[in-house]
Amino acid sequence: AARRIVRAAATVFACLLLFAGCSRPSWTEAERASLRGLSLSSLPPLPPDPSNAVADRRDAAELGQRLFFDPRLSANGKVSCAHCHQPALRFTDGLPLGQGLGPLERHTPSLVGAAYSPWQFWDGRADSQWAQAIGPMEHPREMGLARTEIVRRVGEFYGDAMRAIFGSFPILEDRARFPADAAPREDDPRAREAWEAMAPEDRVTVDRALARTGKVIAAYERQLLPGPAPFDR
């Protein structure tokens, strides 16, 4: 019995030594500084976007939010920017691969904090948020509208609001001058032919209006910033 007591005491002592060795680590100040540097709270202010004069305007962001959630800016009237970038899912879609009008080849990236990146899309092919914002609208398997039709619909639904911000925005009522299927797309010869048949000044008008559409959406997306994560606490 005495041996059992001694053996039990030795076991308890060994456990105490083990737990003592597993106590909370003591961080050096240098280590703490390194950890603080990984916190989202250490992010600097958003860098300016010199290519977007309305990037930080509240009225532009509010209008951009309306466009972001509007499925009328798609070929079937059912797909909005928010279709793939859902607020409840951290502005992703929760799917392995994106799904717009058709299946896509890549996972939908989050828009949270995207304003900090100088490059947009997985391959970095856009160098601004506003250039990224207009890409899915023209993509045949995302929102699927031709360039002229995007501008026509934005002018119809939001023309007054766009003019209040930019001073001008076209109403493309003349379908002979502005065909609904005209776009400078390499993968659609018919759309490209219709685009190249337009007068150069009309193409400039459409391009400028499309860029302005992207810029108000980017003003909204610029407000999607990360909050504190459990690591930060």
Indicate residue ranges for each PLM-predicted region:
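N-terminal amphipathic/basic-hydrophobic helices that include classical n-h-c signal peptides
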Residues: 1-9
